[in-house]
Amino acid sequence: MAILINKKTKVICQGFTGSQGTFHSEQAIAYGTNMVGGVTPGKGGHTHLDLPVYNTVHEAKAKTGANASVIYVPPGFAADSILEAIDAEIEVVVCITEGIPVLDMVKVKRALVGSKTRLIGPNCPGVITPGECKIGIMPGHIHKRGTIGIVSRSGTLTYEAVAQTTAVGLGQSTCVGIGGDPVNGTNFVDCIDMFLKDDETKAIIMIGEIGGNAEEDAAEFIKQSKIKKPIVSFIAGITAPPGKRMGHAGAIIAGGKGSAEDKLEALQSAGVTITRSPADIGKTMFDLLNKG
């Protein structure tokens, strides 16, 4: 099953002919992703990477039947690109762009309400269902088809969890990078809900970080959920000082809230297994699944 994307997913790229769009589309095609075209305004009618280029998302969807889009567009224009994809009713939209103004994302968040679109990101590595479909910037070769669902606010820590679960032979069902911005499209609760309902996903790894209350919300959801699966969590930023932004725009302890200890406490009370070192994520999951 997996979640969000599979081998049947038809993907277009917004910002297709730019350097980032070109490079990562080449990587996706090489991985086996079903890329069906791309969008660059003003370049419609041309071909790029042997795929058709369209002026608008509406046109691309009408001609290709695309149901997913990946966005490699500079921050000043990225929100408009997301809004265009929402307007075209693209089912899964993955926005990689970092640095989109918060007010722009507030407008996007409003447009998502009641829409047919699921937004992943922005400021994220993307989504991958190993061996089937790769949408984003993650290195494909470290992934292996398997049974662990991974959801993370951090890109590089996602790769760490992936490499470790591959190394211990567990593999991944789907990996979702939800992004490190304060306003994003899909949160931990959304992903954990999908993983809990997915037959192929036997256990979940959740990687959080300081700032906001997304992890606390996830802990409450896990506590209330009737479906139970083993969950391992790592929270980055245990030693982070209050008031200092740590890399991501959303990674800041403010107003006395959002500390790693608060999040760890909430998750532990929900029955989640905690690891305090990113080096132990895979081993912790392996041991949890093989105990007694």
UniProtKB/Swiss-Prot annotation:
What is the protein name for this chain? Succinate--CoA ligase [ADP-forming] subunit alpha
Q: Does the keyword Nucleotide-binding apply?
A: yes
Q: Which species is this record about?
A: Rickettsia felis (strain ATCC VR-1525 / URRWXCal2) (Rickettsia azadi)
Identify the residues that bind CoA: T17, G18, S19, Q20, K43, I96, T97, E98
Q: Which residues bind substrate?
A: Y159
Q: What pathway does the annotation place this protein in?
A: Carbohydrate metabolism; tricarboxylic acid cycle; succinate from succinyl-CoA (ligase route): step 1/1
EC numbers listed for it are: 6.2.1.5
Q: Which UniProt keywords apply?
A: Ligase, Nucleotide-binding, Tricarboxylic acid cycle
Q: Which residues form the active site?
A: H248
